Amino acid sequence: MQHEHIYFSVRMRAAQGGSHEQGGKHISGGEKIVPYHDLSSCMAELAEKGLNHSRGKPDFMNIQFEQIEEAVKYVSPLPVGTHVVSSVADGQATARSLLTEAGIKPQVIEEAYYVLSELTELRGALFIDAATGQRLDDPIKNGVRVTRMDWPLDDFSCWLNEHQLSPNIRMKEALALATKVTQHPATIAELCWSDDPDYITGYVASQKFGYQRISQLKELGEEKGCRIFFVDQTKMKNLDAYINYLTTQPVLIRWKQEVMADESRSMAGRAAE
């Protein structure tokens, strides 16, 4: 069997005080899509991430991999912008402004913030109906975890160099997730900030304006994160189909190949002139 042309989905989750299902505190999680020959190093990397995390030391960790049977979807990363703010209040005001620009009504935005405020911990994404502000996902499950997406490091490094940005693995992971989520036509916008106490940057993402980083969306030391998807139910078959896309459709981000393709098309066009 030729493994080199087959991809595997690798997932890690770590908790403290027992497993997540037993009510343990979420410590860390990770997602990778890799060929067979990278499985060993990938699992070691995810284990290291879970064992050395600012949220604490886990006493439970699960790492699993499975061969991907579905066709992998290759997509270009969202365009990126950055908003430097001086306070959490300014950052949150910027987030609200961007959500409004994406087409979310102010009352729906405030309803989403209220739903978030009632939760003590969020392990995945909340779904908010962009028309009504109603929460659509199952509250018992405490959020839907998006899986099966990645951005190969060599391609990401080329993207960083082109955009003159410093290496940032957090951005790599977040931009890969946001790109997958907003590829679905039902996702109008995503609002996110990390549950890591030492990371205060967050973002709003939308197909309308890309991935907009906001330098501060919470106070340093705060462990409560946020991930909200504002969705248009008229653009999905049903909620189960939307969740199925988020949790099972494999997506790999490709930037370098798209640039090369654009250059080839441009050269072909000039040659034809």
Swiss-Prot record:
Sorted UniProt keywords: ATP-binding, Biotin biosynthesis, Ligase, Magnesium, Nucleotide-binding
Catalytic activity: heptanedioate + ATP + CoA = 6-carboxyhexanoyl-CoA + AMP + diphosphate
Keyword presence, Signal: no
Signal peptide: none
A GO MF label: magnesium ion binding
Chain segments annotated as transmembrane: none
InterPro entries attached to this UniProt entry: BioW
Annotated metabolic or biological route of this protein: Metabolic intermediate metabolism; pimeloyl-CoA biosynthesis; pimeloyl-CoA from pimelate: step 1/1
Cofactor(s) in the UniProt record: Mg(2+)
Domain of life where this protein originates: Bacteria
Enzyme Commission no: 6.2.1.14
GO biological process per UniProt: biotin biosynthetic process
Assembly notes: Homodimer.
Function text: Catalyzes the transformation of pimelate into pimeloyl-CoA with concomitant hydrolysis of ATP to AMP.
Family the entry assigns: Belongs to the BioW family.
The protein, known as: 6-carboxyhexanoate--CoA ligase
Name of the gene encoding the protein in the UniProt record: bioW
